[in-house]
Amino acid sequence: MEVKDIFSYDWSYLLPEFIILGFATFLSLLDLFAGKRLGKQVIGWLSFLGTVIAAIFVIINMNALNKPYSYMIDMIRIDDYGNAFKLIFLAGTAFAILISLSYLKAGEVQHRGEYYYLLLTGLLGAMVMASSADLITLFVGLELLSLSSYVLVGLRKKSRLSNESAFKYVVSGSIATAVLLFGMSYVYGLAGTTHIYEISFRLAEAGMAGYQFLVYTAFAFLAVGLAFKISAAPNHMWAPDVYQGAPTPVTVFLAVVSKAAGFALIFRVMMISFFNVSDGTGSGRFFFEEGSLYLGLMAAASMIIGNTMALRQTNVKRMMAYSGIAQAGYLLVPFVPPTSLFFSEVIFYLFGYLLVSFGAFAVIMVVSREQETEDLKGFAGLYHRSPVMAIAMSIFLLSLAGIPITVGFFGKFYLFMGTLVVENYWLAAIMIITSVISYYYYFGIIRQMYMRPGTTEAPMVVPKGIWTFILIMAIATVFFGAFPGLVTDYIQIHFNPSFDFGNMLSPSSQ
Protein backbone atom coordinates (compact mmCIF):
# COMPACT_ATOMS: atom_id res chain seq x y z
CA MET A 1 0.00 0.00 0.00
CA GLU A 2 1.40 3.40 -1.02
CA VAL A 3 1.17 6.65 0.93
CA LYS A 4 -1.29 8.13 -1.56
CA ASP A 5 -3.67 5.25 -0.87
CA ILE A 6 -4.00 6.38 2.75
CA PHE A 7 -5.64 9.63 1.63
CA SER A 8 -8.00 7.83 -0.73
CA TYR A 9 -9.96 6.21 2.10
CA ASP A 10 -13.10 7.66 3.62
CA TRP A 11 -11.89 7.86 7.21
CA SER A 12 -15.25 9.06 8.53
CA TYR A 13 -16.27 5.46 9.24
CA LEU A 14 -13.48 5.26 11.83
CA LEU A 15 -14.51 8.46 13.60
CA PRO A 16 -15.86 6.56 16.66
CA GLU A 17 -12.43 4.99 17.24
CA PHE A 18 -10.65 8.30 16.62
CA ILE A 19 -12.96 10.04 19.10
CA ILE A 20 -12.28 7.51 21.86
CA LEU A 21 -8.53 7.65 21.14
CA GLY A 22 -8.62 11.45 21.18
CA PHE A 23 -10.55 11.63 24.45
CA ALA A 24 -8.27 9.06 26.12
CA THR A 25 -5.17 11.01 25.06
CA PHE A 26 -6.64 14.39 25.98
CA LEU A 27 -7.85 13.21 29.40
CA SER A 28 -4.50 11.67 30.25
CA LEU A 29 -2.79 15.00 29.53
CA LEU A 30 -5.53 16.93 31.32
CA ASP A 31 -5.15 14.74 34.40
CA LEU A 32 -1.38 15.16 34.30
CA PHE A 33 -1.31 18.96 34.06
CA ALA A 34 -4.63 20.13 35.53
CA GLY A 35 -6.10 17.15 37.38
CA LYS A 36 -5.87 18.66 40.86
CA ARG A 37 -7.46 21.95 39.82
CA LEU A 38 -10.31 20.42 37.82
CA GLY A 39 -11.13 17.47 40.03
CA LYS A 40 -11.52 13.86 38.99
CA GLN A 41 -15.30 14.13 38.55
CA VAL A 42 -14.73 16.41 35.57
CA ILE A 43 -12.52 13.78 33.93
CA GLY A 44 -15.23 11.20 34.58
CA TRP A 45 -17.94 13.27 32.95
CA LEU A 46 -15.70 14.08 29.98
CA SER A 47 -15.08 10.34 29.55
CA PHE A 48 -18.82 9.77 29.52
CA LEU A 49 -19.22 12.56 26.95
CA GLY A 50 -16.64 10.88 24.73
CA THR A 51 -18.55 7.59 24.71
CA VAL A 52 -21.81 9.37 23.88
CA ILE A 53 -20.28 11.27 20.96
CA ALA A 54 -18.66 8.08 19.64
CA ALA A 55 -22.00 6.24 19.88
CA ILE A 56 -23.69 9.00 17.88
CA PHE A 57 -21.16 8.57 15.07
CA VAL A 58 -21.62 4.79 15.12
CA ILE A 59 -25.34 5.34 14.57
CA ILE A 60 -24.56 7.79 11.75
CA ASN A 61 -22.29 5.18 10.16
CA MET A 62 -25.06 2.59 10.41
CA ASN A 63 -27.37 4.79 8.37
CA ALA A 64 -24.70 5.78 5.83
CA LEU A 65 -23.16 2.34 5.27
CA ASN A 66 -24.74 0.32 2.45
CA LYS A 67 -22.06 -2.40 2.28
CA PRO A 68 -18.92 -3.33 4.23
CA TYR A 69 -16.06 -0.84 3.95
CA SER A 70 -12.45 -1.89 4.44
CA TYR A 71 -9.18 -0.10 5.19
CA MET A 72 -5.53 -0.97 4.55
CA ILE A 73 -5.88 -4.07 2.40
CA ASP A 74 -8.86 -5.35 4.39
CA MET A 75 -7.11 -5.17 7.77
CA ILE A 76 -10.06 -3.26 9.24
CA ARG A 77 -13.64 -3.92 8.15
CA ILE A 78 -16.57 -1.63 8.98
CA ASP A 79 -19.84 -3.55 8.74
CA ASP A 80 -23.17 -4.10 10.47
CA TYR A 81 -21.78 -6.79 12.75
CA GLY A 82 -18.98 -4.58 14.05
CA ASN A 83 -21.28 -1.57 14.51
CA ALA A 84 -23.74 -3.61 16.57
CA PHE A 85 -21.00 -4.76 18.92
CA LYS A 86 -19.58 -1.25 19.14
CA LEU A 87 -22.90 0.03 20.44
CA ILE A 88 -22.83 -2.69 23.12
CA PHE A 89 -19.25 -1.72 24.06
CA LEU A 90 -20.01 2.00 24.17
CA ALA A 91 -23.17 1.56 26.22
CA GLY A 92 -21.37 -0.75 28.64
CA THR A 93 -18.47 1.65 29.12
CA ALA A 94 -20.81 4.62 29.53
CA PHE A 95 -22.76 2.74 32.22
CA ALA A 96 -19.50 1.76 33.95
CA ILE A 97 -18.44 5.41 34.02
CA LEU A 98 -21.81 6.51 35.43
CA ILE A 99 -21.73 4.10 38.38
CA SER A 100 -18.03 4.88 38.87
CA LEU A 101 -18.79 8.55 39.45
CA SER A 102 -20.59 7.50 42.63
CA TYR A 103 -18.36 4.55 43.54
CA LEU A 104 -15.06 6.42 43.36
CA LYS A 105 -16.17 9.20 45.71
CA ALA A 106 -15.24 7.04 48.67
CA GLY A 107 -11.56 7.13 47.68
CA GLU A 108 -11.17 3.38 47.25
CA VAL A 109 -9.24 3.97 44.02
CA GLN A 110 -6.30 6.30 44.48
CA HIS A 111 -5.66 7.22 40.84
CA ARG A 112 -9.12 8.16 39.68
CA GLY A 113 -7.95 10.06 36.61
CA GLU A 114 -6.08 7.03 35.31
CA TYR A 115 -9.13 4.91 36.00
CA TYR A 116 -11.32 6.77 33.52
CA TYR A 117 -8.96 6.88 30.57
CA LEU A 118 -7.97 3.27 31.14
CA LEU A 119 -11.66 2.45 30.66
CA LEU A 120 -11.52 4.35 27.37
CA THR A 121 -8.39 2.56 26.16
CA GLY A 122 -10.01 -0.77 27.02
CA LEU A 123 -13.08 0.33 25.09
CA LEU A 124 -10.90 1.29 22.12
CA GLY A 125 -9.34 -2.17 22.14
CA ALA A 126 -12.78 -3.79 22.09
CA MET A 127 -13.88 -1.59 19.18
CA VAL A 128 -10.76 -2.48 17.19
CA MET A 129 -11.45 -6.17 17.85
CA ALA A 130 -15.00 -5.83 16.52
CA SER A 131 -13.77 -4.33 13.24
CA SER A 132 -10.64 -6.44 12.73
CA ALA A 133 -10.38 -8.46 9.54
CA ASP A 134 -6.74 -9.37 10.11
CA LEU A 135 -5.02 -11.36 12.84
CA ILE A 136 -2.54 -8.53 13.49
CA THR A 137 -5.09 -5.78 14.14
CA LEU A 138 -7.21 -8.27 16.02
CA PHE A 139 -4.35 -9.11 18.38
CA VAL A 140 -3.49 -5.42 18.86
CA GLY A 141 -7.08 -4.71 19.91
CA LEU A 142 -7.14 -7.76 22.16
CA GLU A 143 -3.97 -6.72 23.98
CA LEU A 144 -5.15 -3.12 24.31
CA LEU A 145 -8.29 -4.35 26.06
CA SER A 146 -6.43 -6.95 28.12
CA LEU A 147 -3.63 -4.69 29.37
CA SER A 148 -6.11 -1.96 30.33
CA SER A 149 -8.21 -4.54 32.19
CA TYR A 150 -5.19 -5.89 34.09
CA VAL A 151 -4.41 -2.42 35.45
CA LEU A 152 -8.06 -1.60 36.23
CA VAL A 153 -8.45 -4.77 38.30
CA GLY A 154 -5.45 -3.86 40.47
CA LEU A 155 -6.15 -0.15 40.98
CA ARG A 156 -7.13 -0.66 44.64
CA LYS A 157 -3.47 -0.85 45.59
CA LYS A 158 -4.10 -0.96 49.35
CA SER A 159 -6.41 -3.97 49.03
CA ARG A 160 -4.70 -7.34 49.36
CA LEU A 161 -7.64 -9.00 47.62
CA SER A 162 -7.38 -6.61 44.68
CA ASN A 163 -3.64 -7.18 44.33
CA GLU A 164 -4.11 -10.93 44.46
CA SER A 165 -6.87 -10.90 41.85
CA ALA A 166 -4.83 -8.65 39.54
CA PHE A 167 -1.85 -11.01 39.78
CA LYS A 168 -4.03 -14.03 38.98
CA TYR A 169 -5.66 -12.16 36.11
CA VAL A 170 -2.31 -11.20 34.56
CA VAL A 171 -0.91 -14.73 34.86
CA SER A 172 -4.07 -16.41 33.54
CA GLY A 173 -4.43 -13.84 30.79
CA SER A 174 -0.82 -14.27 29.70
CA ILE A 175 -1.25 -18.04 29.46
CA ALA A 176 -4.47 -17.62 27.46
CA THR A 177 -2.75 -15.13 25.15
CA ALA A 178 0.11 -17.58 24.59
CA VAL A 179 -2.36 -20.35 23.71
CA LEU A 180 -4.23 -18.00 21.37
CA LEU A 181 -1.00 -16.93 19.66
CA PHE A 182 0.01 -20.56 19.30
CA GLY A 183 -3.26 -21.24 17.50
CA MET A 184 -2.75 -18.16 15.31
CA SER A 185 0.74 -19.37 14.40
CA TYR A 186 -0.76 -22.64 13.16
CA VAL A 187 -3.31 -20.69 11.13
CA TYR A 188 -0.63 -18.47 9.60
CA GLY A 189 1.60 -21.45 8.86
CA LEU A 190 -1.23 -23.22 7.05
CA ALA A 191 -2.68 -20.19 5.27
CA GLY A 192 0.38 -18.01 4.63
CA THR A 193 -1.65 -14.87 5.34
CA THR A 194 -3.08 -12.97 8.31
CA HIS A 195 -6.19 -11.72 6.46
CA ILE A 196 -9.14 -13.51 8.03
CA TYR A 197 -11.28 -13.61 4.89
CA GLU A 198 -8.41 -15.06 2.84
CA ILE A 199 -7.62 -17.54 5.62
CA SER A 200 -11.10 -19.01 5.14
CA PHE A 201 -10.19 -20.24 1.65
CA ARG A 202 -6.56 -21.08 2.39
CA LEU A 203 -7.51 -23.32 5.33
CA ALA A 204 -10.03 -25.10 3.12
CA GLU A 205 -7.24 -25.79 0.63
CA ALA A 206 -4.93 -26.96 3.43
CA GLY A 207 -7.60 -29.34 4.68
CA MET A 208 -8.11 -30.80 1.23
CA ALA A 209 -4.32 -31.17 0.85
CA GLY A 210 -4.13 -33.51 3.83
CA TYR A 211 -3.42 -31.06 6.67
CA GLN A 212 -6.77 -31.49 8.39
CA PHE A 213 -5.22 -32.51 11.70
CA LEU A 214 -3.25 -29.25 11.86
CA VAL A 215 -6.37 -27.26 10.93
CA TYR A 216 -8.31 -28.94 13.74
CA THR A 217 -5.42 -28.34 16.15
CA ALA A 218 -5.41 -24.64 15.29
CA PHE A 219 -9.15 -24.48 15.92
CA ALA A 220 -8.76 -26.14 19.34
CA PHE A 221 -6.02 -23.76 20.49
CA LEU A 222 -7.95 -20.71 19.30
CA ALA A 223 -11.10 -21.91 21.06
CA VAL A 224 -9.28 -22.46 24.36
CA GLY A 225 -7.62 -19.03 24.13
CA LEU A 226 -10.88 -17.26 23.34
CA ALA A 227 -12.65 -19.11 26.16
CA PHE A 228 -10.61 -16.98 28.57
CA LYS A 229 -11.99 -13.77 27.09
CA ILE A 230 -15.61 -14.87 27.55
CA SER A 231 -14.91 -16.68 30.86
CA ALA A 232 -16.16 -19.99 29.46
CA ALA A 233 -15.00 -23.48 30.37
CA PRO A 234 -12.28 -24.73 30.30
CA ASN A 235 -10.63 -21.33 30.82
CA HIS A 236 -13.03 -19.88 33.39
CA MET A 237 -11.22 -20.29 36.69
CA TRP A 238 -9.89 -16.74 36.83
CA ALA A 239 -13.35 -15.14 36.88
CA PRO A 240 -14.50 -15.66 40.52
CA ASP A 241 -11.29 -14.31 42.08
CA VAL A 242 -11.03 -11.38 39.67
CA TYR A 243 -14.70 -10.42 39.96
CA GLN A 244 -14.43 -10.47 43.76
CA GLY A 245 -11.20 -8.48 44.00
CA ALA A 246 -11.79 -5.85 41.32
CA PRO A 247 -13.64 -2.56 41.96
CA THR A 248 -17.32 -3.24 41.27
CA PRO A 249 -17.58 -1.00 38.16
CA VAL A 250 -14.54 -2.82 36.72
CA THR A 251 -16.16 -6.15 37.54
CA VAL A 252 -19.25 -5.36 35.51
CA PHE A 253 -17.09 -3.86 32.72
CA LEU A 254 -15.34 -7.23 32.45
CA ALA A 255 -18.64 -9.10 32.72
CA VAL A 256 -20.24 -7.22 29.82
CA VAL A 257 -17.77 -5.36 27.59
CA SER A 258 -14.90 -7.85 27.75
CA LYS A 259 -17.27 -10.80 27.33
CA ALA A 260 -19.02 -9.19 24.35
CA ALA A 261 -15.63 -8.47 22.76
CA GLY A 262 -14.77 -12.14 23.10
CA PHE A 263 -17.91 -13.13 21.22
CA ALA A 264 -17.07 -10.63 18.48
CA LEU A 265 -13.74 -12.45 18.18
CA ILE A 266 -15.41 -15.84 17.97
CA PHE A 267 -17.27 -14.66 14.89
CA ARG A 268 -14.33 -12.96 13.21
CA VAL A 269 -11.75 -15.66 13.91
CA MET A 270 -13.59 -18.94 14.43
CA MET A 271 -16.59 -18.73 12.14
CA ILE A 272 -15.08 -16.94 9.16
CA SER A 273 -11.62 -18.53 9.22
CA PHE A 274 -12.93 -22.09 9.49
CA PHE A 275 -16.16 -21.65 7.56
CA ASN A 276 -15.03 -23.27 4.31
CA VAL A 277 -12.96 -26.09 5.83
CA SER A 278 -14.19 -29.56 4.85
CA ASP A 279 -15.00 -32.14 7.51
CA GLY A 280 -12.67 -34.66 5.87
CA THR A 281 -15.32 -36.69 4.05
CA GLY A 282 -16.19 -33.95 1.59
CA SER A 283 -19.85 -34.23 2.55
CA GLY A 284 -19.96 -31.38 5.06
CA ARG A 285 -18.18 -28.44 6.63
CA PHE A 286 -15.92 -28.69 9.64
CA PHE A 287 -17.44 -25.72 11.49
CA PHE A 288 -20.95 -27.15 11.22
CA GLU A 289 -19.85 -30.59 12.36
CA GLU A 290 -16.74 -31.10 14.54
CA GLY A 291 -16.20 -27.37 15.22
CA SER A 292 -19.75 -26.85 16.40
CA LEU A 293 -19.55 -29.96 18.55
CA TYR A 294 -16.45 -28.57 20.29
CA LEU A 295 -18.18 -25.24 20.95
CA GLY A 296 -21.27 -27.15 22.09
CA LEU A 297 -19.23 -29.05 24.67
CA MET A 298 -17.75 -25.73 25.85
CA ALA A 299 -21.27 -24.30 26.14
CA ALA A 300 -22.56 -27.31 28.06
CA ALA A 301 -19.57 -27.35 30.43
CA SER A 302 -19.92 -23.61 31.07
CA MET A 303 -23.64 -23.87 31.84
CA ILE A 304 -23.18 -26.85 34.16
CA ILE A 305 -20.05 -25.62 35.97
CA GLY A 306 -21.26 -22.04 36.28
CA ASN A 307 -24.66 -22.85 37.73
CA THR A 308 -23.60 -25.70 40.02
CA MET A 309 -20.60 -23.84 41.46
CA ALA A 310 -22.75 -20.77 42.10
CA LEU A 311 -24.87 -22.85 44.49
CA ARG A 312 -21.98 -23.00 46.97
CA GLN A 313 -21.13 -19.29 47.03
CA THR A 314 -21.82 -16.93 49.91
CA ASN A 315 -20.04 -13.94 48.36
CA VAL A 316 -22.41 -12.20 45.95
CA LYS A 317 -19.73 -11.08 43.49
CA ARG A 318 -18.30 -14.60 43.27
CA MET A 319 -21.82 -15.88 42.74
CA MET A 320 -22.30 -13.42 39.90
CA ALA A 321 -18.96 -14.54 38.44
CA TYR A 322 -20.17 -18.12 38.23
CA SER A 323 -23.46 -16.84 36.86
CA GLY A 324 -21.42 -15.04 34.18
CA ILE A 325 -19.69 -18.31 33.29
CA ALA A 326 -23.12 -19.87 32.79
CA GLN A 327 -24.23 -16.87 30.70
CA ALA A 328 -21.19 -17.42 28.46
CA GLY A 329 -22.40 -20.97 27.94
CA TYR A 330 -25.86 -19.75 26.96
CA LEU A 331 -24.33 -17.27 24.50
CA LEU A 332 -22.29 -20.02 22.85
CA VAL A 333 -25.46 -21.97 22.05
CA PRO A 334 -26.36 -20.00 18.86
CA PHE A 335 -22.98 -20.95 17.37
CA VAL A 336 -23.73 -24.69 17.64
CA PRO A 337 -24.20 -24.67 14.68
CA PRO A 338 -25.16 -21.12 13.66
CA THR A 339 -28.46 -20.44 11.93
CA SER A 340 -29.26 -17.46 9.73
CA LEU A 341 -30.72 -15.70 12.79
CA PHE A 342 -27.90 -16.41 15.25
CA PHE A 343 -26.82 -12.75 15.04
CA SER A 344 -30.19 -11.50 16.30
CA GLU A 345 -30.15 -14.02 19.14
CA VAL A 346 -26.66 -13.04 20.32
CA ILE A 347 -27.19 -9.27 20.11
CA PHE A 348 -30.57 -9.40 21.84
CA TYR A 349 -29.16 -11.55 24.64
CA LEU A 350 -26.16 -9.23 25.06
CA PHE A 351 -28.50 -6.22 25.14
CA GLY A 352 -30.57 -7.75 27.92
CA TYR A 353 -27.46 -8.92 29.77
CA LEU A 354 -26.09 -5.37 29.57
CA LEU A 355 -29.15 -3.91 31.31
CA VAL A 356 -29.43 -6.62 33.94
CA SER A 357 -25.74 -6.87 34.81
CA PHE A 358 -25.21 -3.17 35.32
CA GLY A 359 -28.40 -2.87 37.34
CA ALA A 360 -27.57 -5.85 39.56
CA PHE A 361 -23.97 -4.82 40.18
CA ALA A 362 -25.08 -1.27 40.96
CA VAL A 363 -27.33 -2.65 43.71
CA ILE A 364 -24.52 -4.90 44.94
CA MET A 365 -22.23 -1.87 45.05
CA VAL A 366 -24.67 0.14 47.16
CA VAL A 367 -25.50 -2.70 49.56
CA SER A 368 -21.91 -3.87 50.05
CA ARG A 369 -20.78 -0.32 50.78
CA GLU A 370 -23.47 0.28 53.38
CA GLN A 371 -23.14 -3.14 55.03
CA GLU A 372 -19.34 -3.29 54.58
CA THR A 373 -19.62 -6.84 53.31
CA GLU A 374 -20.23 -8.57 49.99
CA ASP A 375 -21.73 -11.66 51.61
CA LEU A 376 -25.31 -12.75 51.09
CA LYS A 377 -26.17 -11.74 54.64
CA GLY A 378 -25.68 -8.12 53.64
CA PHE A 379 -28.93 -8.35 51.65
CA ALA A 380 -30.93 -9.52 54.68
CA GLY A 381 -33.94 -7.28 55.27
CA LEU A 382 -33.18 -5.05 52.29
CA TYR A 383 -36.87 -4.73 51.45
CA HIS A 384 -37.56 -3.08 54.81
CA ARG A 385 -34.65 -0.64 54.44
CA SER A 386 -35.09 0.22 50.76
CA PRO A 387 -38.11 -1.28 48.97
CA VAL A 388 -37.07 0.21 45.62
CA MET A 389 -33.61 -1.38 45.77
CA ALA A 390 -35.09 -4.75 46.76
CA ILE A 391 -37.70 -4.72 44.00
CA ALA A 392 -35.14 -3.61 41.41
CA MET A 393 -32.70 -6.34 42.46
CA SER A 394 -35.53 -8.88 42.29
CA ILE A 395 -36.26 -7.81 38.71
CA PHE A 396 -32.61 -8.21 37.73
CA LEU A 397 -32.33 -11.64 39.34
CA LEU A 398 -35.58 -12.83 37.77
CA SER A 399 -34.28 -11.69 34.39
CA LEU A 400 -31.01 -13.57 34.86
CA ALA A 401 -33.05 -16.64 35.78
CA GLY A 402 -35.16 -16.24 32.63
CA ILE A 403 -38.52 -15.61 34.30
CA PRO A 404 -41.33 -13.88 32.31
CA ILE A 405 -41.90 -10.95 31.81
CA THR A 406 -38.28 -9.78 31.67
CA VAL A 407 -35.81 -9.20 28.88
CA GLY A 408 -33.80 -12.20 30.10
CA PHE A 409 -36.75 -14.54 29.49
CA PHE A 410 -36.97 -13.69 25.81
CA GLY A 411 -33.19 -13.78 25.48
CA LYS A 412 -33.13 -17.39 26.66
CA PHE A 413 -36.32 -18.20 24.76
CA TYR A 414 -34.79 -17.12 21.44
CA LEU A 415 -31.64 -19.13 22.16
CA PHE A 416 -33.73 -22.16 23.09
CA MET A 417 -35.84 -21.97 19.94
CA GLY A 418 -32.66 -21.67 17.88
CA THR A 419 -31.37 -24.96 19.30
CA LEU A 420 -34.62 -26.67 18.37
CA VAL A 421 -34.39 -25.37 14.80
CA VAL A 422 -31.03 -27.12 14.31
CA GLU A 423 -32.22 -30.15 16.34
CA ASN A 424 -29.67 -29.74 19.13
CA TYR A 425 -32.02 -31.34 21.63
CA TRP A 426 -29.24 -32.34 24.04
CA LEU A 427 -28.07 -28.73 24.31
CA ALA A 428 -31.65 -27.50 24.73
CA ALA A 429 -32.13 -30.00 27.57
CA ILE A 430 -28.98 -28.76 29.31
CA MET A 431 -30.21 -25.17 28.94
CA ILE A 432 -33.49 -26.02 30.67
CA ILE A 433 -31.92 -28.09 33.46
CA THR A 434 -29.20 -25.55 34.28
CA SER A 435 -31.69 -22.68 34.16
CA VAL A 436 -33.81 -24.48 36.75
CA ILE A 437 -30.70 -25.02 38.90
CA SER A 438 -29.96 -21.29 38.74
CA TYR A 439 -33.31 -20.52 40.36
CA TYR A 440 -31.96 -21.77 43.68
CA TYR A 441 -29.17 -19.24 44.09
CA TYR A 442 -31.01 -16.35 42.44
CA PHE A 443 -34.01 -16.89 44.70
CA GLY A 444 -31.59 -17.29 47.61
CA ILE A 445 -30.76 -13.59 47.32
CA ILE A 446 -34.46 -12.72 47.00
CA ARG A 447 -35.20 -14.77 50.10
CA GLN A 448 -32.58 -12.80 52.03
CA MET A 449 -34.08 -9.48 50.95
CA TYR A 450 -37.67 -10.29 51.90
CA MET A 451 -37.67 -13.07 54.49
CA ARG A 452 -34.55 -12.57 56.61
CA PRO A 453 -34.21 -9.91 59.31
CA GLY A 454 -31.45 -7.38 58.77
CA THR A 455 -28.98 -6.04 61.30
CA THR A 456 -30.76 -2.67 61.22
CA GLU A 457 -34.13 -1.24 60.23
CA ALA A 458 -32.70 2.18 59.38
CA PRO A 459 -33.56 3.34 55.85
CA MET A 460 -30.76 2.84 53.35
CA VAL A 461 -29.18 6.02 52.03
CA VAL A 462 -28.72 5.70 48.27
CA PRO A 463 -27.06 8.47 46.21
CA LYS A 464 -29.60 10.06 43.87
CA GLY A 465 -27.51 9.39 40.78
CA ILE A 466 -27.09 5.68 41.42
CA TRP A 467 -30.73 5.39 42.57
CA THR A 468 -31.90 6.87 39.25
CA PHE A 469 -29.57 4.60 37.28
CA ILE A 470 -30.85 1.45 39.02
CA LEU A 471 -34.47 2.51 38.54
CA ILE A 472 -33.94 3.11 34.80
CA MET A 473 -32.25 -0.29 34.37
CA ALA A 474 -35.12 -2.02 36.21
CA ILE A 475 -37.79 -0.29 34.14
CA ALA A 476 -35.91 -1.07 30.91
CA THR A 477 -35.59 -4.74 31.93
CA VAL A 478 -39.35 -5.05 32.34
CA PHE A 479 -40.26 -2.82 29.39
CA PHE A 480 -38.15 -4.70 26.84
CA GLY A 481 -39.33 -7.95 28.39
CA ALA A 482 -42.90 -6.90 27.69
CA PHE A 483 -42.08 -5.53 24.22
CA PRO A 484 -39.07 -7.50 22.91
CA GLY A 485 -40.14 -6.81 19.35
CA LEU A 486 -38.90 -3.23 19.67
CA VAL A 487 -35.34 -4.52 19.96
CA THR A 488 -35.59 -7.43 17.53
CA ASP A 489 -37.23 -5.26 14.87
CA TYR A 490 -34.52 -2.64 15.29
CA ILE A 491 -31.83 -5.31 14.87
CA GLN A 492 -33.49 -6.71 11.76
CA ILE A 493 -33.87 -3.28 10.18
CA HIS A 494 -30.41 -1.89 10.91
CA PHE A 495 -28.04 -4.85 11.21
CA ASN A 496 -28.99 -7.36 8.49
CA PRO A 497 -29.13 -10.29 10.92
CA SER A 498 -29.98 -12.90 8.27
CA PHE A 499 -26.30 -13.41 7.57
CA ASP A 500 -25.45 -15.05 4.24
CA PHE A 501 -23.02 -17.77 5.29
CA GLY A 502 -22.24 -18.65 1.70
CA ASN A 503 -20.84 -15.20 0.93
CA MET A 504 -17.58 -15.11 2.86
CA LEU A 505 -15.58 -13.07 0.36
CA SER A 506 -13.38 -10.24 1.54
CA PRO A 507 -14.81 -6.73 1.04
CA SER A 508 -12.38 -5.93 -1.78
CA SER A 509 -13.56 -8.91 -3.81
CA GLN A 510 -17.28 -8.44 -3.40
Swiss-Prot record:
It is an enzyme of class 7 (translocase). The keyword rRNA processing does not apply. Pfam families: Proton_antipo_M (PF00361). GO terms for cellular component: plasma membrane. It is a multi-pass membrane protein. Keywords: Cell membrane, Membrane, NAD, Quinone, Translocase, Transmembrane, Transmembrane helix, Transport. GO terms for molecular function: NADH dehydrogenase (ubiquinone) activity; NADH:ubiquinone reductase (non-electrogenic) activity; quinone binding. The chain crosses the membrane at residues 14-34, 42-62, 84-104, 113-133, 135-155, 170-190, 208-228, 247-267, 286-306, 323-343, 346-366, 390-410, 426-446, 466-486. The keyword Transport applies. It catalyses: a quinone + NADH + 5 H(+)(in) = a quinol + NAD(+) + 4 H(+)(out). Its main location: membrane. One of its GO terms (biological process) is ATP synthesis coupled electron transport. It comes from the Bacteria. It is found in: Cell membrane. Its EC number is 7.1.1.-. PANTHER family: NADH DEHYDROGENASE. NDH-1 shuttles electrons from NADH, via FMN and iron-sulfur (Fe-S) centers, to quinones in the respiratory chain. The immediate electron acceptor for the enzyme in this species is believed to be a menaquinone. Couples the redox reaction to proton translocation (for every two electrons transferred, four hydrogen ions are translocated across the cytoplasmic membrane), and thus conserves the redox energy in a proton gradient. Belongs to the complex I subunit 2 family. NDH-1 is composed of 14 different subunits. Subunits NuoA, H, J, K, L, M, N constitute the membrane sector of the complex. This is NADH-quinone oxidoreductase subunit N. It comes from Brevibacillus brevis (strain 47 / JCM 6285 / NBRC 100599).
